[in-house]
Amino acid sequence: MTKEEQRQRIGQRIAEMRSTVKWTDENRVKRTGMTQAELSRLCGIRQNHISRIERGYYSAGFDQLQQIAEALGCQIDLVRQ
């Protein structure tokens, strides 16, 4: 898999997680979906960077991926290929 294909695959996964994440607020009301702006606010990464990551135009570093994962309530697992 080329680096470009890897970037696109990571971006697609982030977009999928962002659109399917669920959480419960103080009133126990479930919400689904999250905009790039909401994710940006939660993880501290500019919205235009999130957009570029999702589209595969920007290669996010591990720190940025960790911030995104935490904001989405996920964790990053490293798997040896």
Residue ranges with predicted function:
Residues 23-52:
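Short alpha-helical DNA-recognition segment
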Residues 61-78:
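DNA major-groove recognition helix of helix-turn-helix/homeodomain DNA-binding modules
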Residues 11, 40-43, 69:
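Small-residue (primarily alanine) positions within well-ordered alpha-helices
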Residues 19, 44, 55-57:
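Residue-level detection of the helix-turn-helix DNA-binding "recognition helix"
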Residues 81:
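Small, basic N-terminal interaction modules of short regulatory proteins
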Residues 13, 24, 35, 61-64:
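Residues that mark the N-terminal boundary/hinge immediately upstream of a DNA-recognition element
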Residues 1-31:
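A short, Lys/Arg-rich alpha-helix, primarily the initiator
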